[in-house]
Design a protein with these regions (language model features):
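Peri-transmembrane interface segments
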Residues: 252-255, 266-300
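Transmembrane alpha-helical interface segments in multi-pass membrane proteins
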Residues: 12, 17, 21, 25, ...
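Short cytosolic juxtamembrane segments of multi-pass membrane proteins
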Residues: 404-419
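Transmembrane helix-loop junction
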Residues: 53, 175-176, 363, 367, ...
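Short, membrane-interfacial amphipathic segments enriched in basic
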Residues: 1-14
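Mid-to-C-terminal secondary-structure elements
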Residues: 123, 132-159, 163-267
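Hydrophobic, regular-secondary-structure patches
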Residues: 49-133, 140-143, 175-176, 227-228, ...
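Generic structural signal for small/hydrophobic residues in well-ordered secondary structure
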Residues: 23, 51, 69, 99, ...
Length: 419
């Protein structure tokens, strides 16, 4: 009995694909909507998966036991920032010192000021780098954020105390200015109209939010030096709080309590600053990807609906064209279930072919994006491929039911007489 059923299933599949091959152009036009729907889902999924992988790597490089304190909301977010946030008072290095002193679960606190200058270029000889990200940091910043040096040293307490004109630069900065010269440590550069000496170069960092890690474009200087170079442009301070091993939740609560008291926040008021951890930043990004994913699903659903309606229409046309064939099969003993099965398999084979084409195109597009836009990470997840193919089969099953039932309901006598 089992071999007979297996043979019947193979015959049904063979007939389905023979029908598709006999009407190749019509079949291709019919599944276009399915192709687009699957293509959109898989491509968007691949981009979001690649971006998530990179942001997890970048955040975890800074340390999974670190807390990031800032007066504005941090982490990836959709939409414009609330303007009320810009009225908040920035944090100060003294706030970090208080957290370190008063929070028992905090091991160390570093601070970093972002230097917002019109001219961010740094020059050496005839070379100039204009994409530098300028930050004035404490001497312990490298230890707290797990930064590694390729050569030279990091900034010291003495550099900060004496406001020395020294810099530590990222991988991209060093390659642009000193690539042909080899070593960068000890060389003089000009920045903000002043001479500075490079004392260290950072190791190349792993991928960031859009592929490239911004730390590769970094230029660090001592915090007090930064206050001289840009006295008004260095007010925004980020505190990086390192919790003791296994005490991150306690450190988070203690740091929040200390900062709320220092900033005069009442018990019934929300905090006028933001505390983030690696897990929170990843959760924020996951929320964004979920929203983008819903939009992609909505777009692909429209395409799949259009494709499904097209499949249903073409299958109804096929029922009309093959009325006599259906009559012959019924006269030879085919049951209603056999006719339903045949037309359902044809509909699912049609939409599955569209799903396969959509997946193959999506893989090609993802690889092309990696070549043309390296900063836009793309990694096709296996679940997206499986989901795309499964949905395409489901579309054929749903929209093939009516034509299949209509074919099965034909009277064999009337079908044989159909012209």
């Amino acid at each position: 009995m089992a071999p007979a059923r297996s043979g019947l299933a193979l015959d049904t599949l063979r007939m389905a694909f023979d029908t598709l091959r006999a009407h190749r152009l019509r079949s291709a036009l019919t599944v276009f909507g399915v192709v687009i729907g699957v293509l959109v889902v898989v491509v968007v999924s691949s981009i979001l998966t690649g971006m998530r992988r990179n942001i997890v790597q970048a955040v975890e490089e800074y340390g999974t036991s670190n807390i990031f304190a800032f007066h504005l909301t941090t982490g990836p977010q959709l939409g414009p920032r609330d303007r009320a946030e810009f009225r908040r008072k920035p944090l100060r290095p003294e706030d970090g010192a208080a957290v370190k002193e008063l929070a028992p679960s905090v091991e160390d606190v570093a601070h970093c000021a972002f230097l917002w200058l019109d001219d961010r270029s740094i020059a050496h000889g005839g070379e100039k780098y204009s994409r530098a990200s300028l930050q004035a940091v404490s001497a312990n910043y490298a230890d707290v954020t797990n930064l590694s040096l390729r050569e030279g040293r990091f900034l010291t307490e003495s550099d900060d105390e004496h406001r020395r004109p020294v810099l530590v630069v990222g991988h991209n900065v060093a390659e642009a200015l000193f690539g042909a010269l080899g070593s960068a440590a000890g060389r003089e550069v000009r920045f903000a109209g002043r001479p500075f000496r490079v004392v260290g170069v950072l190791e190349k960092r792993k991928g960031g939010f859009m592929g490239e890690n911004e730390d590769d474009n970094i230029v660090f200087m001592p915090y007090r030096t930064g206050r001289i170079v840009a006295p008004r442009a260095s007010d925004w301070v980020l505190l990086v709080i390192r919790a003791r091993s296994g005490e991150l939740p306690l450190a988070l609560d203690q740091a929040e309590d200390v900062l709320r008291r220092r900033r005069g926040v009442r018990a019934n008021e929300p905090s006028n600053f933001d505390l983030s951890t690696a897990d929170r930043i990843i959760q924020q990004f996951d929320g964004i990807t979920a929203a983008i994913g819903l939009v992609a699903i909505a777009i692909s659903s429209v395409s799949l609906l259009v494709g499904g309606i097209g499949v249903m229409n073409i299958m109804l046309v096929s029922v009309t064209e093959r009325t006599q064939e259906i009559g012959v099969r019924k006269a030879l003993g085919a049951r209603r279930g056999d006719i339903v099965r045949q037309f359902l398999v044809e509909a699912m084979a049609l939409t599955l072919s569209g799903g396969v084409i959509g997946v193959l195109l999506a893989i090609g597009v993802s690889r092309l994006l990696l070549v043309l836009l390296p900063a836009l990470p793309s990694q096709v997840p296996p679940w997206a491929v499986v989901a795309g193919l499964t949905v395409s089969i489901g579309v054929g099953l749903v929209f093939g039911v009516w034509p299949a039932r209509r074919a099965a309901a034909l009277d064999p006598v009337e079908a044989l007489r159909y012209e």
